C-alpha cells in the first residue's frame, strides 16, 4: 500500500524526457504549417522552441536517470524533423518556392542532416576514438545548421528584400551549410567550454545583453550567433590538431577537474545532498506525515 504513490510518481518522471522530445517534434512540424500560411515569424519562433526543448530533454533524462536506447533514437528522429525537414520546408515556402533550383537546394539540406545524424550515432558506438574527441563534433551539428538556414529568413524579416534574398545567394548559402554538416571539420561542443572564474561577471553581463537582444533585435541576434559560430571553427580546428599531437594534455585536464571535485567534497565533509524534484528523504518527518513510513521504523 505504501509503495504505490512512489512507483506512480517514478513512472511519471521517467516519461518526462520523451514527452519533451515529442513536444519538440510537434513544434517543428507546426512551424511548417505557419510557413505555409505566410506567418514566418511564428515559424521561426516554433523552430526556436523545438531547439530549446531538444536541448533540455537530454539533460532532464540524465538528472532523472531516465536515459534509454529508445530515448536516444526518438531524439535523433526529432533532430531530423526539427533541424532538417522543418527549416528546409520553411525556407522553401517563404523564399524559394518560385524557382526549381531552390527546390534542389532544399532537398540537399535535409539529406545532409540525416547523413550527419547517422554518422553521429555511429560514432557514439565507436570505442576506438581518442578521449579528447569528446570535446568536438565531427562536422556542423544539426541545430547549428538549422540556425544557419533560418538566418536567411531572419535577414529578410530584418532588412527586407536585397541581394541576400536572391536565389543564387540563398542556394549557395544552403549548399555551403549542407557541406559543413557532412564535413569532417571539428567543431567545439559548447557544453565543454568553461568560463574562468575571473570572467564570471563579464559572462553574466553578456547573458543580460543576450536576453535584451532576444526581445529587442531577435533577427540580428540570430546572425550574431551564426557569425560567432563560424568564426570559432578555425580555433576549433587548431585546438583539435594540438590535442591530437598532445593527447596527454586532455588527460591532465580531466584529472585536474576530478581532483578539484574531490577536494571540494573533502572541504565540506558534512554537506548533505540537495534533494531534487521534491523527492522525500528516507527517514524524514514529511514521510511520516504522508504515511510512507511508520514512526520509529528505519528503511533497510
From Swiss-Prot:
It is found in: Cell membrane. Pfam families: CDP-OH_P_transf. It is a multi-pass membrane protein. Its main location: membrane. It comes from the Bacteria. It is an enzyme of class 2 (transferase). The keyword Transferase applies. It catalyses: a CDP-1,2-diacyl-sn-glycerol + L-serine = a 1,2-diacyl-sn-glycero-3-phospho-L-serine + CMP + H(+). GO terms for molecular function: CDP-diacylglycerol-serine O-phosphatidyltransferase activity. GO terms for biological process: phospholipid biosynthetic process. The chain crosses the membrane at residues 10-30, 74-94, 95-115, 135-155, 162-182, 207-227. NCBIfam families: pssA (TIGR00473). This is CDP-diacylglycerol--serine O-phosphatidyltransferase. It comes from Mycobacterium leprae (strain TN). The lineage of its organism: Bacteria, Bacillati, Actinomycetota, Actinomycetes, Mycobacteriales.
